[in-house]
């Protein structure tokens, strides 16, 4: 008890000493600032006097001899970039008087734990030492180093073992399941977090309003898709089978979530998807119906079911761009450039969602200032849900989806998007002009003039 009391007293003394030295450094910095202001003011006065003397001499027809102004620092302030001595003669770098977490000085904040942290920063710092999944302290290894994994977007730190111990991961937002929460397993063994489940599109009927919205969005960019074709939500197995029959193999490096088909196929479409029951239990009674999709350049679009509306819409916009290219005779484009353009359209739709509004004037203003345009394109379709009505998670989810596109470094989708984006920048974000560059770079010629 006595030892603990003595330790607390020592900490208080240390805190007071750090505060005193921090205030001293702040005072020195303020004196330096004032001295520099005084010097600048002196320069301005000297310049004004010289100009006045020149003007007077000129008026009198005399030759004015300028004088060199020699300035010297009187008692120059000590530098706060190097080390300073504190009361007991110890040499301390001012950076040591900053918070270990936010790196701001302690002058305007309370401090804790021997001057290392602001109180709020201390809580944040030590909160991040706990695993996001198991809520336990992230362990140190044999070398005494605390190693952790962290999602690049969500910034949630967790024990590396959870990547391998069967912890559920949401197939939409990629977050691991924290202990004490219940992720939902879909019929094709994918996991979905409760937040993503809240706006998930579960069957073919549910996706049709989004289908019409995406078509209006393309028409607003002068990329109207005239042909009618099927849009079906399917399970993962049906999507993989259709991909094989389309003889597409470049998706294998990534998870396939959508497909624009050109071959006649019989596809099991989900006409009644799963529903949430009592106590957040998923009722997985899925009803499917075999549908024949046939036609010419485009026979239909398949999208995996159970993803949130924002992610489903982005995938649909991507596949709709594939459909537009095929229907308008753009063949034999370089794979990475075609996929990059489709990613760009998916990004454009996501961006339009962040500005969704029921105010037509506001929507028009957004469209006119948008980074993607098609000469004098009218405003894109106005969505049924204003972004102001979104939950905090939905606002983060749309940022996550856009970040996934921009930060992707895969050879086809990621690098393709970056190449196309550079073309768009050089064409002032005009899609049609960018498409001409893509055709030229692919040594391809469209079958029709668009």
From Swiss-Prot:
Residues 1-46 form a coiled coil. Residues 27-87 are annotated as: Disordered. Keywords: Coiled coil. The keyword Repressor does not apply. Residues 27-47, 56-69 have a biased composition (Basic and acidic residues). This is Protein DA1-related 3. It comes from Arabidopsis thaliana (Mouse-ear cress). The gene is DAR3.
């Amino acid at each position: 008890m006595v030892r603990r009391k003595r330790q607390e007293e020592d900490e208080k003394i240390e805190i007071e000493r750090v505060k005193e030295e921090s205030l001293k450094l702040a005072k020195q910095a303020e004196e330096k600032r004032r001295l520099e202001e005084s010097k600048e003011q002196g320069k301005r006065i000297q310049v004004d006097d010289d100009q006045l003397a020149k003007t007077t001499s000129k008026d009198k027809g005399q030759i004015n001899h300028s004088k060199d102004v020699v300035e010297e620092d009187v008692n120059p302030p000590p530098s706060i970039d190097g080390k300073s001595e504190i009361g007991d003669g110890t040499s301390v770098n001012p950076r040591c008087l900053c918070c270990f977490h936010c790196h701001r000085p302690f002058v305007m904040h309370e401090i804790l734990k021997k001057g290392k942290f602001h109180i709020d920063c201390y809580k944040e710092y030590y909160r991040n030492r706990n695993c996001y999944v198991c809520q336990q302290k992230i362990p140190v290894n044999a070398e005494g180093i605390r190693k952790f994994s962290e999602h690049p977007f969500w910034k949630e730190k967790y024990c590396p073992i959870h990547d391998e111990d069967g912890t559920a991961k949401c197939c939409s937002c990629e977050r691991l399941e924290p202990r004490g929460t219940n992720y939902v397993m879909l019929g094709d063994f994918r996991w979905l977090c409760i937040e993503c489940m809240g706006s998930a599109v579960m069957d073919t009927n549910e996706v049709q309003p989004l289908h019409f919205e995406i078509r209006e969005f393309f028409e607003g960019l002068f990329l109207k898709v005239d042909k009618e074709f099927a849009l079906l939500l399917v399970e993962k197995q049906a999507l993989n089978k259709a991909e094989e029959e389309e003889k597409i193999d470049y998706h294998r490096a990534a998870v396939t979530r959508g497909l624009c088909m050109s071959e006649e196929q019989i596809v099991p479409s989900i006409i009644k998807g799963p529903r949430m029951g009592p106590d957040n239990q998923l009722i997985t009674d899925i009803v499917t119906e075999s549908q024949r999709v046939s036609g010419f350049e485009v026979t239909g679009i398949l999208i995996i079911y159970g993803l949130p509306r924002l992610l489903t819409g982005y995938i649909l916009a991507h596949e709709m761009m594939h459909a537009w290219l095929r229907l308008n005779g753009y063949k034999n484009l370089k794979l990475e450039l075609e996929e990059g353009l489709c990613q760009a359209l998916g990004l454009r739709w996501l961006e339009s969602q962040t500005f969704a509004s029921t105010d037509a004037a506001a929507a028009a203003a957004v469209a006119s200032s948008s980074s993607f345009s098609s000469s004098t394109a009218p405003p894109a379709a106005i969505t049924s849900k204003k972004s102001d009505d979104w939950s905090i998670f939905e606002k983060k989810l749309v940022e996550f989806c856009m970040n996934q596109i921009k930060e992707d470094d895969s050879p086809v989708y990621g690098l393709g998007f970056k190449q196309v984006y550079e073309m768009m920048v050089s064409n002032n974000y005009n899609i049609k002009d960018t498409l001409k560059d893509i055709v030229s770079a692919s040594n391809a010629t469209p079958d029709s003039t668009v």
